[in-house]
Each structure stands twice: as C-alpha cells, then as structure tokens.
Amino acid sequence: MRSVHSLPGHDEPQVVEVPTPQAAPAQVLIETLAAAVNPVDVFVATGAGRGAVNAGDRLGLGWDVSGRVLAVGDQVTTIAVGDVVAGVDDVMVGENRAQADLVLLDADAVAVVPDGLDPVDAASIPLNSLTAAQAVDLLGDPDGRTLLVTGAGGAVGGYAVALARSAGWTVTGLGRPGDEEFVRSTGADFTADAERAAYDAVLDGAVLQQEGLAFIRDGGTFVGVQPSAPVPTERGITVTAVKVVRDASRLAELLDRSVTGELAVRVAGTAPLADAATVYAKVGSGGQRGRWLLVP
C-alpha cells in the first residue's frame, strides 16, 4: 500500500510503498476515504521538523482520516467491520500514520460518521475540533468572562469560537477582515485589531504566543496550542497549552454537531494521495480556510 512519509534528505513529502498493516487486538484497520493535511504536517515534512520530533529514517504523516473499517481486533466492541468512521492519530511519531491507503488506529481514537455528514468531508474534523474543544476546557469557568480567540478564521480558531460560545463565553474572534462574515455567523463578535488588556482570556489559535498575552487583563488566562513551546507568564496570567489527545466519545459529539451546522465543515479542496507534495505546498503557503484532503 501507499503511505505519505517524511524522509531524510527531502523537504517535501514522499509517497512510498509499505507493507499492509494488521490490526492488533485493540485496533481497527481503515480503508481510507480521505486524510487531511494540516500545517503541522507541512512542518514535520521538512528537515527542521524532522529534527524537532526526533524522527527516525521513516516518519509517517497525517493526523485525520475517514474511511471504511476493514478489520477489527478481537478486543474491539465499539466499532464493527463495514462502519464508516473518522479518527485521529495522536501519536506524533510513527512509521505509518493517517495519510495512507490503509490506516491502523486504536479503537478509542475513532467514531462512526453520522448520517448527514459527507464521509470524505469528515476527515477535516477530528484533529482541529478536538484541539479546540480540549483548549476550551482549559479556559475554566466562562461565567461573566470575555474571551478573545486569535486566528478565528482558521481551523482550530473557527471551532474554538463556536465551542466557546456554546459553553457560555462572551467571545470575540480576532482575524483577517475577510474572516468577519464567518466569525459573526457563529454569533461571536469580530475584530481585526484587538484592544490590549481588554479580555479575561485568550485562546491562541493563531499561535501568537507571547504577543497574545498583551490582550489579557491582569490575572487572566492564556491557552496556547503549542505545548512544546511554553509561553512565559506575566502580570499574574495563568498560561497553559492544549496537547490534543484521542477521545472517541468527544469526537462522536463533535461529528454530530457538524451535521446540525453548529460546527462548520470547511474543506478547501481534495487531491489524489499521489499529489501530496502539491497539496503540502498549498498548505505551506498559508492563508487556507478549510482543510485540504488527500484521497486515494
């Protein structure tokens, strides 16, 4: 089968032939319908990115996948052969990951795609929606508090705006002027130029890092999305960062909320798996709204 890898000596992804995997007792084997390409994939595909994650000779790429279950391990009771599922590979370093013809995932990392959700589009949801949901959890009690979501037009930021609103936060999205219509469609306020020290909390979808603290009142809360690059605290601000972890029940809920329209499903485009390098170049150029998907 084919798998997208980062290889030594290459700064773009390589599509290579690898053996067909076999499901372990707690795993499911998925025939891929689509796999998303995220900015983190583009970073890891480069020499600098490989070094940052201590990659070996072969490093599989991809976090999100949707597809049909071909086989299940003998300990799996929640997923059946034939189910159409979406899932997240939350192990940063692995020889074969989500961008492949066939994908192995632990059963607790996948959820059945609900009726009404396009199975291909479902591949755009797991990583970014789970990251946003778990980041909102870290913000604490929303009662009477204001939140600025940076990068509100992006994938994590867009989900975070909607999820924080539904959790009870008074939300303002910070983004480009072209993002205003999308952000306001969630019921949140929008700004392209946020006021300093005006918010109780910041969820940093744009990865502003230290710069993002400037928008927070003394004693507020900052939640970042780069756990490997901690932000030094100041002015009594509580600083933390989300490290996404698999959560099948939460993913099922997020997929359901995508069907109802509460969470927007945004796909920038699809391309064959063989054209991974072209898609990586598009994602690496920045400014994408929605995820590019690789299809076998």
Task: Write out the residue ranges for each language-model feature.
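Glycine-rich beta-strand-centered segment in the early N-terminal region that forms part
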Residues: P19-V37, G49-V91
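Residue-level marker of beta-strand positions
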Residues: D64, D83-V84, L102, T146, ...
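NAD(P)H dinucleotide-binding glycine-rich loop of Rossmann-like/cofactor-binding domains
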Residues: T78, G87-G151
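Local beta-strand N-terminus motif with an aromatic residue
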Residues: A100, G144, A188, A198-D200, ...
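Mid-domain Rossmann-like dinucleotide-binding core that forms the NAD(H)/NADP(H) cofactor-binding site
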Residues: A123-D193
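Glycine-rich cofactor phosphate-binding loops and adjacent beta1-alpha1 units
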Residues: T172, F182-T240
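C-terminal hydrophobic helical "lid"/dimerization subdomain
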Residues: L251-P296
